[in-house]
């Protein structure tokens, strides 16, 4: 039952997700591709988290933040991808009203948390390169925990506030969401209430978070660039740049796609383009981040080799003892 009588109004009890395509063949192809991407996302991010936890060489603030970023990427992708995979195979792509609110709230929470963590990681690189002698004091365990906990609290408050403001609106039909998940714009289009206040509040909130985090990242890297250019050692410059390249790549990919969807005027792109870009930043980027941070990072590659070496050595000892 998609509608429920509520006084003088008919309230929506479930939504229909239009998805990416109606073509049955294309659905199978997309299901296979996105399933493979999701499996790589889960394995890659879990491996990053476990490697940082078990390797004492990686017990540094930078990797502490990276492990939380991996957790966020895992949660971000999982808030949307499993449901999208089910809808590729299902005939009736419905999601309950409560399910839609949970999906929207989860996606908002992890999206905002990613912004905060990327800003925190930029600040960490700034302190490491510009104030190396004070790094252990400025980025102590206590400070790192406070930064992460603050990011989680801020994201939770924002997600709760935005979700409540949207799902307090009246939805009385139609109930087709022209997207593959419960996103802000498609939901607002379905409301039969006055949406001016929720739209203004949500836009201000998103704009403020984006501006603050981008400002922190931009200022951090401006000081980093100035410091690196003053270095006389070519090796020192190369080492400093190499520690920042991965983070800058992740920042560019994430903020580039988010800006395309939430900052650019809606008249500049179609709904289908919006869907494609959404797939990129919610499904593809969480898969790419572990690769971006590990491929150019000698410490992570070294820790992985040591852990694999220990595993092989212990297994060979077991086989030797048995023989």
From Swiss-Prot:
Keyword Transmembrane carried by entry: yes
One GO CC term, this protein: plasma membrane
Alphabetic keyword roster: Cell membrane, Disulfide bond, G-protein coupled receptor, Glycoprotein, Membrane, Olfaction, Receptor, Sensory transduction, Transducer, Transmembrane, Transmembrane helix
Membrane topology of the entry: Multi-pass membrane protein
PROSITE patterns in the record: G_PROTEIN_RECEP_F1_1, G_PROTEIN_RECEP_F1_2
Annotated signal sequence range: none
Gene Ontology process terms (BP): G protein-coupled receptor signaling pathway; sensory perception of smell
Localization of this protein: Cell membrane
Transmembrane segments: 29-49, 58-78, 103-123, 137-157, 200-220, 241-261, 275-295
SUPFAM superfamilies named in the record: Family A G protein-coupled receptor-like
Molecular-function GO terms, alphabetical: G protein-coupled receptor activity; olfactory receptor activity
Gene3D superfamilies in UniProt: Rhodopsin 7-helix transmembrane proteins
Cystine crosslinks: 100-192
Cytoplasmic side: 50-57, 124-136, 221-240, 296-323
Pfam families: 7tm_4
Extracellular topological segments: 1-28, 79-102, 158-199, 262-274
Function: Potential odorant receptor.
Name recorded for this polypeptide: Olfactory receptor 5P58
Species of provenance: Mus musculus
